[in-house]
Design a protein with these regions (language model features):
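The feature marks the mature, well-folded catalytic cores of soluble enzymes
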Residues: 1-177
Length: 177
């Protein structure tokens, strides 16, 4: 099943193309979501690749798991370069909530559950103000050393299964041998 936010981006792209606007995608060019958009739009640009300066109007969408602050910064820059920027760039609500929670976390360690290949998981690790740990499997989790951490927060990337999250919580709560 496709995420409703991703479906909304695809509808937005179709609308931008119908308006005759060149489409700029903010995201990782190798991410499945960005590749899917590019497959629908011939000649789409992936930031920082941009339409020529003589183009006056552009349409912008973003990978839904991008850092919301980074997307806003890039869109602001595009507004300075082009006369009209029709933006439908948005980060999915769950991703934004996770990013905000990580930014506001006051502990001294954060465990981010998710694959090392997940851009969403990597972004959560990047924006944390404290020491971060990442685990995508129980084997990776068991190799981590939390002994120097007083307050550990736990979050997960968008595609991390709830069952893995629950398994990790149960393992962390076990009595230490």
């Amino acid at each position: 099943a496709t995420c409703p936010f991703v479906e909304r981006v695809h509808r937005a792209v179709a609308s931008l193309v119908a308006q005759g606007l060149p489409v700029v995608i903010i995201g990782n060019p190798r991410h499945a979501e960005v590749m899917g958009i590019r497959g629908e739009v011939e000649g789409a640009y992936v930031y920082p690749d941009l339409p020529p300066h003589d183009i006056r109007r552009i349409g912008v969408v973003s990978q839904t798991t991008m850092n919301a602050d980074e997307v806003a910064r890039i869109v602001d820059g595009l507004r300075k370069r082009y006369d009209s920027v029709e933006t439908m760039a948005e980060v999915c609500h769950a991703t934004k909530v996770r990013q905000d929670a990580v930014r506001n976390f006051k502990g001294d360690g954060l465990l981010v559950l998710g694959s090392a290949n997940s851009s969403n998981t990597r972004r959560l690790c990047e924006i944390a103000a404290c020491r971060t740990f990442r685990a995508g499997t129980m084997q990776e989790l068991k190799a981590l050393d939390f002994t120097s951490v007083n307050i550990l927060g736990i979050t997960s990337g968008a595609s991390t299964p709830e069952s893995f999250f629950s398994e990790v919580i149960a393992w962390l709560r076990r009595p230490n041998p």
